[in-house]
Regions:
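Soluble oligomerization/assembly scaffold segments of membrane-associated complexes
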Residues: 130, 135-241
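Extracytoplasmic strand-loop-helix segments at the start of, or within, the mature domains
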Residues: 29-102
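Charged, long alpha-helical assembly modules
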Residues: 231-324
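Positively charged n-region of N-terminal signal peptides that target proteins for export
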Residues: 1-5
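Bacterial N-terminal signal peptides
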Residues: 9-17
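Signal peptide-directed extracytoplasmic domains
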Residues: 79-134
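Sec-dependent signal peptide cleavage junction
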Residues: 18-32
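Second-shell loop/turn segments in exported
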Residues: 39-43, 109-116, 139-146, 190-193, ...
Length: 324
């Protein structure tokens, strides 16, 4: 009886934790819808006054209409938001604006200074923002000097948390892990024949959707399950012969970590990924003309499970025949 009580209590606690994390993902969009009718601006603390004015102009700031206080991302704020050691020498130039969009509008990200955001593309930001729980919003990024752009999302986290969103650390960690994986792989392959950043972004969107679908139907996924999803998806997008084994493992590690996250319990997660995929494909011209866009990486796991079930049933039937 005592054992049963402890097991029941553990199950209740696990359920509560799951619901809280899923609720946090939902709260992201709810707060955006309720609070960001006027845009909010987060500026890097390393900007000079001239750079600050220049960046605000790039972001579309209008002092007569944008009456919210400007926020500043300092090294101290960054360390608290990202749960890392405080480094006072950290240079923060990337700045961002976030504003709500209508419910039927897809997530938008625009880099106003693409010449200065050297490592992260608009679609990489969009992919990571979906992982964070953003469904429909307009995010704008700018920097006055060349920077990688990897810290820009931290400004979005800061803004959201300042407005009451309780972002689980795992959601932020996953979004940053994804952003780093995408930007590193893109940077390492940008001059390689056969590589296409659009295909990489769509492949990752498909991988995330397949992981969510597989977890819903199968429960906990093994690393082999996730590996199968990743490898089959990269092959479908003709990236399997382009990316290295180490890069594949980076994607697998991210996808496996994602499979354990409660962000997948957000019912709008896969819909937002579908919208993201469709918009990338629509803007990419003929890059996807020879690609199966209806490919389902989850099917391979289901087929594998069916084969194992058939083998197991055959074994049972074999032994039953002796008992008859």
């Amino acid at each position: 009886m005592r054992k049963k009580f402890f097991l029941t209590s553990a199950a209740v606690l696990l359920t509560v934790a799951t619901l809280q994390s899923a609720q946090a993902a939902t709260d992201v969009q709810k707060v955006i819808d309720e609070t960001y009718v006027q845009p909010e601006y987060v500026l890097g603390s390393s900007l000079t006054e001239d750079q600050k004015n220049q960046t605000l102009k790039k972001l579309g700031y209008d002092a007569s209409k944008d009456t919210k206080d400007l926020k500043t991302m300092t090294p101290d704020v960054y360390s608290k938001i990202m749960n890392v050691a405080n480094d006072s020498s950290l240079q923060l130039y990337s700045s961002a604006k976030i504003q709500k969009l209508g419910e039927k509008s897809p997530l938008e990200v625009k880099i106003e200074t693409p010449e200065n955001i050297t490592k992260v593309t608009q679609d990489m930001y969009r992919n990571a923002a979906v992982t964070l729980g953003v469904e429909h919003a307009r995010i704008t990024v700018a920097a006055p000097i060349p920077v990688t752009g990897e810290s820009a999302l931290a400004g979005i986290y800061y803004s959201l948390e300042s407005n009451g969103v309780k972002l689980p650390q795992e959601n932020k960690d996953l979004a940053q892990e994804e952003l780093k994986a995408l930007s590193d792989i893109n940077d390492e392959n940008k001059d390689k024949s056969g590589f296409d950043a659009n295909k990489l972004n769509v492949a990752l969107a498909d991988i995330k959707a397949a992981v969510a679908k597989a977890k819903e139907s199968k429960g906990e996924l093994t690393e082999d399950d996730v590996r199968k999803i990743v490898e089959d998806t990269l092959k479908n997008y003709k990236l399997d012969q382009v990316v290295t084994g180490n890069q594949v493992n980076v994607i697998i590690n991210f996808a496996f970590n994602l499979s354990k996250s409660d962000i997948l319990n957000n019912e709008d997660f896969t819909k937002t990924l579908k919208d993201l995929k469709q918009s990338i494909v629509a803007q990419a011209g003929d890059s996807f003309s020879n690609i199966d866009l209806n490919f389902d990486a989850n099917k391979a796991i289901q087929d594998g499970g069916n084969i194992l079930s058939s083998i197991w049933q055959a074994i049972l039937d074999f032994f039953k025949s002796f008992g008859a």
